[in-house]
Amino acid sequence: MHIKFKWLSFGSLSLVYATMIMGVYLSSIHKSLSCPDWPLCPNGLFRLPEQGYIIEYIHRIFVILAASMIYITAIFAYLKLKNMQRLTILASVLVTIQILIGALVVTTKLELMFVSIHLPVGVALFGITLLTFLFFLRKTSTSTMYK
């Protein structure tokens, strides 16, 4: 059907998962505020970060990549796959909310309310990207199964 959508949705899922793993790792080593500025770390986007916040820097790069992939997937679904629009639009809304919550986590210096919301929204985003990928696979496998 649309092999591009398969790879876009899988790419979104993979990038969201990798971003979550990095975020959990940062939390577990107590380095969530190793890069205290938002949206960029003190060295900016294109200069190599200092050793103290390289994981946080990579986490933010992955956020940019994941969000971009999710938005591109939603645009593709809007233009080509009407039956996938709702899930991809929901993923786009969730990733936008997640970015805003992440900004609040950093700018409020780990305010408990925002930290407490950040992970569940990420889990919901992961779930929606997983459902998008699985529903598309199911639809394509059942549509080709009976031909």
Regions found by a protein language model. Give the residues of each.
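Polytopic transmembrane helical bundles with strong interfacial aromatic enrichment
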Residues: 1-147
